[in-house]
Amino acid sequence: MVRRLARGCWSAFWDYETPKVIVVRNRRLGFVHRMVQLLILLYFVWYVFIVQKSYQDSETGPESSIITKVKGITMSEDKVWDVEEYVKPPEGGSVVSIITRIEVTPSQTLGTCPESMRVHSSTCHSDDDCIAGQLDMQGNGIRTGHCVPYYHGDSKTCEVSAWCPVEDGTSDNHFLGKMAPNFTILIKNSIHYPKFKFSKGNIASQKSDYLKHCTFDQDSDPYCPIFRLGFIVEKAGENFTELAHKGGVIGVIINWNCDLDLSESECNPKYSFRRLDPKYDPASSGYNFRFAKYYKINGTTTTRTLIKAYGIRIDVIVHGQAGKFSLIPTIINLATALTSIGVGSFLCDWILLTFMNKNKLYSHKKFDKVRTPKHPSSRWPVTLALVLGQIPPPPSHYSQDQPPSPPSGEGPTLGEGAELPLAVQSPRPCSISALTEQVVDTLGQHMGQRPPVPEPSQQDSTSTDPKGLAQL
């Protein structure tokens, strides 16, 4: 059983299949066929070639450089703040932080003091609760082994060797966000597509003082990349006061989608804004960082002011895609479109053979099996030999009145005017209708009908046309 199955699979593996054209006159099936072809054609023409521009060679991710510069002045309750104090880092890049609120721990010096109660397992009741030399990575210093009173209240915490007093959440609080919406941010951006050797920037080549009198407007000044901080936060869909209090990350996305088949003036940057940090996740929302300012008292004691800053971080993100006509993707997509049109024929074949195949009529018309004869004949092809009159009827169909062939060496001598046997008889002239009758008669022989024995030729044309080719 297994051997027979394997033999059948091996034999089927070497079969060759070729399409067979059948015309099915069915309007519903023809309508489905044309509609599928139309939908496929519309998909490739409208979406693939017009929307996706698949006839172009493309490049994504341009090489980009970004420079940022912030300007503006603000003030807290008792202090004026300028750019050098509230912008980090000061040199400007693709990431810039604008401080909007600070918590200040002043006059810290190296010494010993109570650990902050916000540190896990820092509270104690006696020295036994504090292990000398223990270091808590979430704390502010190394424990001395003593349990000391806290800065305020009746609680006690373990003493640490650190910058004292430690930050405990009761530091001075300064809000800088009152004037922050009017801060301006200049974003200089230039891009380069190396494949197409195309470069462009987001600042118009105009007078040198052009940037001193403009702010960004998509309609009137698209090449003046100076943005108000309040405008950026508003476009990101956020409340400025809330964002300035807790901090957050805003993304400025610059999109350079350029069709290089058009003029350079058609390649323009598109700006969009959105918040990047998770707003509704308390564990990870907001943005803050710490830094310190160091100084000496009396020239000997090193002192610092610790600042925990909350602010709005601006991340400038550049992406884009450039495309230009190329022959290779055009040919590939055209070939794909023409090949995909054949899906309609496949679908209609499935409908025809699955739902409309009554009495397996279409299956018999659709599929044929042709076997090559194991012992091919060396004679002429049947059709050609039949036309030329060179094929004899099968032996079983000879007339009973016809004498059998004489044995070898005993046959009569063929004299002048003697008739040739049928197998070697010269062809006689015939018309097209006679040829048709011969084809029908031959088909009748294969259906079991007795064919008539052809009569001898009335004229001997052997000498002039031995094979009767002139009569075709």
Swiss-Prot record:
Assembly and binders: Homotrimer and heterotrimer; functional P2XRs are organized as homomeric and heteromeric trimers. Homotrimer. Forms heterotrimer with P2RX1. Forms heterotrimer with P2RX6. Forms heterotrimer with P2RX3.
One GO term describing the cellular component: neuronal dense core vesicle
Role this protein plays: ATP-gated nonselective transmembrane cation channel permeable to potassium, sodium and calcium. Activation by extracellular ATP induces a variety of cellular responses, such as excitatory postsynaptic responses in sensory neurons, neuromuscular junctions (NMJ) formation, hearing, perception of taste and peristalsis. In the inner ear, regulates sound transduction and auditory neurotransmission, outer hair cell electromotility, inner ear gap junctions, and K(+) recycling. Mediates synaptic transmission between neurons and from neurons to smooth muscle.
Tissue: High levels in pituitary and vas deferens. Lower extent in spinal cord, bladder, brain, adrenal, testis, sensory epithelia from the inner ear.
Glycosylation sites: 182, 239, 298
Activity modulation notes: Fast activation by external ATP. Exhibits slow desensitization during prolonged ATP activation. Not sensitive to the ATP agonist:alpha/beta-methylene-ATP.
Taxonomic superkingdom: Eukaryota
Listed Pfam families: P2X_receptor (PF00864)
Name recorded for this polypeptide: P2X purinoceptor 2
Subcellular location: Cell membrane
Residue segments, region Disordered: 393-472
Naturally occurring in which organism (per UniProt): Rattus norvegicus (Rat)
Positions on the Cytoplasmic side per record topology: 1-34, 348-472
UniProt record similarity statement: Belongs to the P2X receptor family.
Topology with respect to the bilayer: Multi-pass membrane protein
Amino acid composition bias (Polar residues), ranges on this chain: 456-465
Key words, A-Z: ATP-binding, Cell membrane, Disulfide bond, Glycoprotein, Ion channel, Ion transport, Ligand-gated ion channel, Membrane, Nucleotide-binding, Receptor, Transmembrane, Transmembrane helix, Transport
UniProt-recorded Gene Ontology molecular function terms: ATP binding; cadmium ion binding; cobalt ion binding; copper ion binding; extracellularly ATP-gated monoatomic cation channel activity; identical protein binding; ligand-gated monoatomic ion channel activity; mercury ion binding
Region of interest called Pore-forming motif, as start-end residue ranges on this chain: 309-322
